[in-house]
């Protein structure tokens, strides 16, 4: 080890200690709510269908891009509340905010809808902030962000009409949807508060339950803080026939 490498690693000590405390706070949050911590395999014979995720091959199997499939098997086997910290692997995701190997926190509640999962997330983030002595707010890039729940919410329809001038829930264009999100929609979110984006076009959420009153819209949500995606959630589609039909579409 060179002296530069030694000094670089030594400087990480405060962040590593803070990271360990965050893990403790997250575990305490879920255990207080009767969640079971699990550890599922890192290799799998198949991966969840995600068009924008390229997996790493491991002989004839794949390194897990997420723990979703294994955790859903446990959920179906009768475990009602689960969480885990999982090492995940995705090709082509290297940059300022991405790495091909990263740790994902994933949790499930049997029968819970997407708004319940989002509420879990808001409460967990607030609990972490309190545990770190941050008094319900963080400072990022020199600006304060108030984490007090509930966080502001806006639907995909309203966000795109406001920032980009069109409604992707009635006229979905995947390329335009992605480009306008990065260039117009995300920059329109307030910086001083997190934002929860709700109710995605159904083609952008193939595993999510459709809203009963509008089949063009799926019960999916994503949360953003300081211009970064923090979490996503959706109401699970549990009808096998409908799922097969959605895949065919």
Region annotations inferred by a language model:
Residues 107-137:
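Well-ordered alpha/beta subsegment
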Residues 1-5, 30:
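Auxiliary tRNA-acceptor-end handling modules of aminoacyl-tRNA synthetases
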Residues 32-38, 130-139:
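Surface-exposed helix-capping loop/turn segments at secondary-structure junctions
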Residues 6, 25-27, 35, 41-74, ...:
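A translation/RNA-centric and nucleic-acid-associated enzymatic feature enriched
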Residues 23, 27, 31, 118-125, ...:
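Hydrophobic face of alpha-helices
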